[in-house]
């Protein structure tokens, strides 16, 4: 449940006071332009998000709301031509297979060669 949703201002103030008495503090984080969540193979990007910070028992919890979009990191990885040729020469693999192996291994030459051998 998002605090304050569907409440009138008086109810919201009462709820905030009750939270404060229980040791909970909730504030809006202002000026946030973008939130990026980095995963192994992609990023989740939220532009112009609304961010709330709730502190309870010394722990901070961030609540982020907004329109999210995903961006694949594998597709953006630029593999140097020399690396592709080295993998091709070492394994006899096609350009396509060598490139795919390098992308899947994050550009790790040894790992790409081992996968194709």
Swiss-Prot record:
Query: Sorted alphabetically, which PROSITE patterns does this protein's record hold?
Result: NAC_AB (PS51151)
The keyword Electron transport belongs to this UniProt entry's keyword annotation: no
Q: Which UniProt keywords are present, listed alphabetically? A: Protein transport, RNA-binding, Transport
- Give start and end of each NAC-A/B domain: 9-77
Q: Which GO terms describe its biological process?
A: protein transport
Query: Which InterPro entries has this protein been placed in?
Result: NAC-like_UBA, NAC_A/B_dom_sf, NAC_arc, Nas_poly-pep-assoc_cplx_dom, UBA-like_sf
Keyword Protein biosynthesis (UniProt): no
Q: Which family does it belong to?
A: Belongs to the NAC-alpha family.
Q: What does this protein do?
A: Contacts the emerging nascent chain on the ribosome.
Q: What is this protein called?
A: Nascent polypeptide-associated complex protein
Species? Methanothermobacter thermautotrophicus (strain ATCC 29096 / DSM 1053 / JCM 10044 / NBRC 100330 / Delta H) (Methanobacterium thermoautotrophicum)
Q: What is the lineage of its organism?
A: Archaea, Methanobacteriati, Methanobacteriota, Methanomada group, Methanobacteria
């Amino acid at each position: 449940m998002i605090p304050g949703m569907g409440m009138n201002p008086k109810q919201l103030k009462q709820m905030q006071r009750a939270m404060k008495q229980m040791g909970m503090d909730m504030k809006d984080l202002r000026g946030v332009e973008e939130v990026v969540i980095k995963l192994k193979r992609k990023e989740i990007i939220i532009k112009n998000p609304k961010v709330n910070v709730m502190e309870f028992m010394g722990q901070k919890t961030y609540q982020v709301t907004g329109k999210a979009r995903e961006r694949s990191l594998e597709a953006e990885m630029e593999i140097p031509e020399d690396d592709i040729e080295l993998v091709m020469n070492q394994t006899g693999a096609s350009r396509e297979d060598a490139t795919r192996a390098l992308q899947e291994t994050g550009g790790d030459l040894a790992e790409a060669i081992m996968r194709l051998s």
